[in-house]
């Protein structure tokens, strides 16, 4: 374990995952801690996240990402505006049978994500440096997820070409975005919404699942 990652971080991750109903294998636990160590190290130079305190990263990044894993199914997933890799990296770790693509337009962030892929040997992870509007996949994704990426109107409009009627769009939000839902494009509808409780995190968390109607 990296000296930057403490036994307290390891315990917080284990306890928080159990509270979320997420069963981590020993390998997954170690991979998540390895990711945390890389995030702490690279954040100093690359400004990957506004969260500077490593003691806050377990709850605000790892556990926040794990809070949506019960809504994920195996398949091909896209994390849009992945930034420092949340929730795409945890998704790739917990679903090794899935193909996960992390996309970001910031070159520093995609270089970091590529380093994570290499160091953690995440063979099911693809990193793409591109604007989302310019990205064209070989086939539609089964799921498209974003965390603090943009408004839901932009999220759906910019990624419409990346999915089809079978695709689920998952938007991770803080306060319930009632106004944003009113501005959804006409060909999208709200499939379900879920209030999330993230161990160690104050404030509201919501997951909104969307589908295309056409």
Curated annotation (Swiss-Prot):
GO terms for cellular component: cytosol. It catalyses: guanosine(527) in 16S rRNA + S-adenosyl-L-methionine = N(7)-methylguanosine(527) in 16S rRNA + S-adenosyl-L-homocysteine. The gene is rsmG. It comes from Pseudomonas fluorescens (strain ATCC BAA-477 / NRRL B-23932 / Pf-5). HAMAP family: 16SrRNA_methyltr_G. Keywords: Cytoplasm, Methyltransferase, rRNA processing, S-adenosyl-L-methionine, Transferase. The keyword Methyltransferase applies. Belongs to the methyltransferase superfamily. RNA methyltransferase RsmG family. CDD domains: AdoMet_MTases. Coiled coil: none annotated. Disulfide bonds: none annotated. This is Ribosomal RNA small subunit methyltransferase G. GO terms for molecular function: rRNA (guanine-N7-)-methyltransferase activity. Specifically methylates the N7 position of guanine in position 527 of 16S rRNA.
